[in-house]
Structure formats: C-alpha cells, structure tokens
Amino acid sequence: LAQIDAVVSDLGVDAVKIGMIGSAFTANLVADRLQGMDVPIVFDPVMVATSGSVLADDATIAAFGRLMELATVATPNLPELHRLTGKDDPVESALSLVGKHRCAVLIKGGHEEGDALADALIEEDNMTSWQGQRINTTSTHGTGCTLAS
C-alpha cells in the first residue's frame, strides 16, 4: 500500500491495472486505497497460474467483487469467468458481472478448444467480439496479463 501511495503522490496515475491478488485481506486493502480514484481501472482476476498453481482461494475470489465494483473493465479468462459466477455460458456470466458490479467484462477466449478463438467485450448496452486463429506456440506464460495491460 505504501507503494501505491508513493506512486500516486510522486508521479500521479493515469490508469490502474490490478493483477494477481494473493488474499482477501490484500484485495480489500487495495480496494480501500483505490476507492475514489478517478482513473480507468483494469482488473485481471488471476486465479490460477499458467503452471496450474492455485493463486486465489474462495475468500479472495469473493473479495474480487469489491475490485470489480471499482473497475472500468475486468478481464477474466473462461475458467475465471465460470469461477466468478458459477455459470457455464460465458456471455451470460459476463452479463451477470456487468449487472452486479457495473464494470465492463472482456472475456478472454484463449482457453477455448480448437483453432478458432473469440474474445468479447460485454458492456451494459453493447457487446463487441473478435475472432482469430490460435497461434501455435509454447510461449503462453503471461498472455492474460499482457492483454490486460
């Protein structure tokens, strides 16, 4: 939190990107600190590392709601979206989050099966989607963080 305060007071902030949050306690402290900031906030609700390690327990995932309420856009991948809502349909899940937290949701479709992939930006009154082809590579570590940034 001291780092947030130092950057805000010394340099100023034009936007905020929230990545991996290790506990509900930290999620709530970050939400408290960002409350009232008038800048775009991007929240990537990281739950599982590329290696498969679990990074967010149930309490942390519940606390993600506070961060989504502050966010301009949340960027969950398909498994994260399912975990946040319990719904199987990605668009229905995103609409649920948009309605509950009032932030846009960018669904990252990289976890889809097959070569054709789709991402979708769901807003209160609009949906935009993009289609593309899977790139065959082993260099996939951090792709969600890169997109969110």
Positions of PLM-derived features:
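Conserved N-terminal subdomain of the carbohydrate kinase-like
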Residues: 1-50
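General structural feature for long, well-ordered alpha-helical segments within catalytic domains
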Residues: 3, 25-30, 60-64, 90-94, ...
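Short beta-strands and strand-loop turn motifs
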Residues: 13-18, 42-49, 75-83, 108, ...
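Gly/Ser/Thr-rich beta-alpha loop segments that engage phosphate groups in nucleotides
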Residues: 21, 54, 111-112, 144-146
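Glycine/threonine-rich flexible loop motifs
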Residues: 27-28, 51-57, 84-85
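Conserved phosphate/ATP/ADP-binding segment of small-molecule kinases
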Residues: 57-127, 136
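Short, small-residue alpha-helix embedded
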Residues: 83, 138-149
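Short pre-catalytic strand/loop immediately N-terminal to key active-site residues, enriched for Gly-Thr
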Residues: 127-143
